[in-house]
Amino acid sequence: MGDSVLSAIQQTIIQRKSADPSESYVAQLLHKGEDKILKKVIEEAGEVLMASKDKDPSHLVYEVADLWFHTMILLTHHDLKAEDVLDELSRRQGLSGLAEKAARTES
Protein backbone atom coordinates (compact mmCIF):
# COMPACT_ATOMS: atom_id res chain seq x y z
CA MET A 1 0.00 0.00 0.00
CA GLY A 2 2.14 2.86 1.26
CA ASP A 3 5.52 1.19 0.81
CA SER A 4 5.71 2.13 -2.86
CA VAL A 5 4.84 5.76 -2.09
CA LEU A 6 7.45 5.93 0.66
CA SER A 7 9.99 4.25 -1.59
CA ALA A 8 9.35 6.70 -4.43
CA ILE A 9 9.64 9.69 -2.10
CA GLN A 10 12.80 8.23 -0.58
CA GLN A 11 14.38 7.83 -4.02
CA THR A 12 13.55 11.43 -4.88
CA ILE A 13 15.12 12.65 -1.63
CA ILE A 14 18.26 10.59 -2.29
CA GLN A 15 18.50 12.06 -5.79
CA ARG A 16 18.20 15.56 -4.34
CA LYS A 17 21.36 14.99 -2.26
CA SER A 18 23.38 15.74 -5.37
CA ALA A 19 21.04 18.41 -6.77
CA ASP A 20 21.76 22.12 -6.90
CA PRO A 21 20.53 23.68 -3.63
CA SER A 22 19.33 26.72 -5.55
CA GLU A 23 16.92 24.50 -7.49
CA SER A 24 15.65 22.09 -4.82
CA TYR A 25 14.17 22.62 -1.35
CA VAL A 26 15.37 19.17 -0.26
CA ALA A 27 18.87 19.85 -1.58
CA GLN A 28 18.88 23.14 0.36
CA LEU A 29 18.01 21.38 3.62
CA LEU A 30 20.55 18.62 3.06
CA HIS A 31 23.20 21.17 2.09
CA LYS A 32 22.55 23.29 5.21
CA GLY A 33 23.14 20.26 7.40
CA GLU A 34 21.73 18.44 10.35
CA ASP A 35 20.90 21.44 12.56
CA LYS A 36 18.70 22.98 9.86
CA ILE A 37 17.00 19.63 9.21
CA LEU A 38 16.41 19.07 12.94
CA LYS A 39 14.94 22.55 13.28
CA LYS A 40 12.51 21.74 10.48
CA VAL A 41 11.55 18.38 12.02
CA ILE A 42 10.87 20.09 15.35
CA GLU A 43 8.79 22.76 13.59
CA GLU A 44 6.74 20.13 11.78
CA ALA A 45 6.25 18.12 14.98
CA GLY A 46 4.85 21.24 16.64
CA GLU A 47 2.47 21.73 13.73
CA VAL A 48 1.26 18.15 14.16
CA LEU A 49 0.52 18.85 17.82
CA MET A 50 -1.42 22.00 16.97
CA ALA A 51 -3.37 20.22 14.22
CA SER A 52 -4.29 17.49 16.69
CA LYS A 53 -5.57 20.08 19.15
CA ASP A 54 -7.63 21.69 16.35
CA LYS A 55 -9.55 18.41 15.93
CA ASP A 56 -9.41 18.76 12.13
CA PRO A 57 -8.62 15.31 10.69
CA SER A 58 -7.59 16.54 7.24
CA HIS A 59 -5.27 19.17 8.71
CA LEU A 60 -3.73 16.55 11.00
CA VAL A 61 -3.08 14.21 8.06
CA TYR A 62 -1.53 17.12 6.11
CA GLU A 63 0.82 18.01 8.96
CA VAL A 64 1.78 14.39 9.67
CA ALA A 65 2.69 14.05 5.98
CA ASP A 66 4.98 17.08 6.36
CA LEU A 67 6.55 15.56 9.47
CA TRP A 68 7.12 12.20 7.78
CA PHE A 69 8.64 13.92 4.74
CA HIS A 70 11.07 15.95 6.81
CA THR A 71 11.91 12.92 8.93
CA MET A 72 12.76 11.08 5.72
CA ILE A 73 15.13 13.93 4.84
CA LEU A 74 16.75 13.49 8.26
CA LEU A 75 17.10 9.75 7.66
CA THR A 76 18.71 10.44 4.29
CA HIS A 77 21.16 12.83 5.95
CA HIS A 78 22.26 9.86 8.06
CA ASP A 79 22.36 7.51 5.03
CA LEU A 80 19.27 5.70 6.30
CA LYS A 81 15.99 5.03 4.53
CA ALA A 82 12.32 4.85 5.42
CA GLU A 83 12.70 1.12 4.77
CA ASP A 84 14.98 0.91 7.81
CA VAL A 85 12.19 2.32 9.97
CA LEU A 86 9.65 -0.04 8.38
CA ASP A 87 12.00 -2.95 9.12
CA GLU A 88 12.17 -1.87 12.77
CA LEU A 89 8.38 -1.58 12.96
CA SER A 90 8.10 -5.03 11.39
CA ARG A 91 10.52 -6.42 13.97
CA ARG A 92 8.37 -4.97 16.75
CA GLN A 93 5.09 -6.24 15.30
CA GLY A 94 3.61 -8.87 17.54
CA LEU A 95 5.78 -7.88 20.49
CA SER A 96 4.09 -6.64 23.59
CA GLY A 97 4.88 -2.96 24.01
CA LEU A 98 5.77 -3.60 27.63
CA ALA A 99 8.04 -6.54 26.73
CA GLU A 100 9.76 -4.49 24.01
CA LYS A 101 10.33 -1.62 26.44
CA ALA A 102 11.71 -4.00 29.08
CA ALA A 103 14.11 -5.49 26.52
CA ARG A 104 15.43 -2.00 25.72
CA THR A 105 16.10 -1.17 29.37
CA GLU A 106 17.95 -4.47 29.90
CA SER A 107 20.35 -3.79 27.03
From Swiss-Prot:
Q: From the UniProt record, which GO molecular function terms apply?
A: ATP binding; phosphoribosyl-ATP diphosphatase activity
Entry's localization field: Cytoplasm
- UniProt keyword annotation of Acetylation present: no
Q: In which pathway does it act?
A: Amino-acid biosynthesis; L-histidine biosynthesis; L-histidine from 5-phospho-alpha-D-ribose 1-diphosphate: step 2/9
Instruction: Give the EC number.
Output: 3.6.1.31
| Catalytic reactions of this protein | 1-(5-phospho-beta-D-ribosyl)-ATP + H2O = 1-(5-phospho-beta-D-ribosyl)-5'-AMP + diphosphate + H(+)
Q: Which GO terms describe its biological process?
A: L-histidine biosynthetic process
Q: Which SUPFAM superfamilies match?
A: all-alpha NTP pyrophosphatases
> One of this protein's Pfam families, by short name?
PRA-PH
Concerning Gene3D superfamilies, the annotation shows: MazG-like (1.10.287.1080)
Q: Does the keyword ATP-binding apply?
A: yes
The record's GO CC annotations read: cytoplasm
Instruction: Read off the HAMAP family from this record.
Output: HisE (MF_01020)
Q: What is this protein called?
A: Phosphoribosyl-ATP pyrophosphatase
